[in-house]
C-alpha cells in the first residue's frame, strides 16, 4: 500500500480527499501545516476541528508547530493576490513534500485541491515541480466535485467551517471593501504563468 502525506488545510476540506484517497488504496496521513492562518484563534479553531475529525475518521495526523513567521517571511513584498497565494501554496507543499520524503512516504497531495476557490492549475504545477525536486510522486486529483457535499456534512456534524482561506489578506478580501488586487497574473519561480 502506497503511503501518502496529505497536506490538510482544515477539517471540512479533509473529508472528501481522505475518502477518495482511501478508496484508491493509499495509506493516508494528514499533515496540518498552515502558518498562513491568522489570527491565532482562527488557527486554533481549525487545528482543533482537524484533530477531532482525524480521530473520528481513524486517520493519523501530524501537527507541526505553528510558526506564522515562516509565512510572513515567504510572502514579504508579495502581498498582492495571486502572488502571495502562489508563494503560500509553494511554502506549504514544499514543507509537506520534505516531511513526506523524510518519513518514508511515496506520495503527497493537498486538500487545497478540493476548494473551488483555489487555482487548480497552479497547485498542479507547484505540486509537480516540488515532487521532482524531492524525488516523490505528487498525486494530482481534482477533488472539487466533493467540496459542497463535504462541507454540508461538516456543518451537519458540527465541525468548524471557516469563512475565509486563512491569511490576514484573505480575511480582508473576504470582509473588506478593497478587491483591487484580486485576479492579477503572476509567474512562479519555475517560470509557469498563472
Language-model segments: which ranges?
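Nucleotide-activated chemistry modules centered on ATP-dependent adenylation/adenylyltransferase
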Residues: 1-194
